[in-house]
A protein has these predicted regions:
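Short, Lys/Arg-enriched C-terminal cap helix and immediately downstream tail that follows
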Residues: 60-62, 68-69, 85-86
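N-terminal helix-turn-helix DNA-binding core of bacterial DNA-binding proteins
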Residues: 4-45, 67, 71-79
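Short intrinsically disordered, low-complexity segments
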Residues: 16, 55, 109-110
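Residues within the DNA-recognition helix of helix-turn-helix
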Residues: 52
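Amphipathic alpha-helical dimerization/coiled-coil segments
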Residues: 1-5, 26-27, 80-111
Length: 111
């Protein structure tokens, strides 16, 4: 991953509503959620949510797919993995025991 992409993704997450949207979509899993449900769940006006979804989408962190009249948004798990790997590359000067708690926490958070 290029530093520029990592900065774009981290910047997209560095706002309260966008971080909440992202976390909600991660929690929703691969089935995702329609934009309307996201707006209701987070109590965000639809026009505000639309702008936030565009920023997250442009950063590659989420994807939207039209299903009938709705757009279903999902977290881009490949992008998330890439960002985590980028952040953890060359971690701890090769001392795996330092990274073990981080990896254990990540595994326990997953389904």
């Amino acid at each position: 991953m290029e530093s520029k992409l990592a900065l774009s993704q981290l910047s997209a997450l560095a706002q309260e509503n966008r971080l909440a949207v992202f976390r909600l979509l991660v929690k929703a899993g691969p089935d995702g959620l329609p934009a309307g449900e996201i707006a209701v769940a987070l109590n965000v006006p639809p026009n505000t949510l639309s702008a936030q979804l565009n920023i997250l989408s442009n950063a590659g962190l989420i994807e939207g797919a039209r299903q009938g009249r709705s757009i279903i948004y999902t977290a881009n798990y490949d992008a998330i993995s890439g960002l985590i790997v980028f952040l953890m590359e060359d971690c701890c000067q090769g001392r795996a025991e330092v990274c073990t708690p981080i990896m254990a926490a990540a595994q326990s958070a997953c389904c």
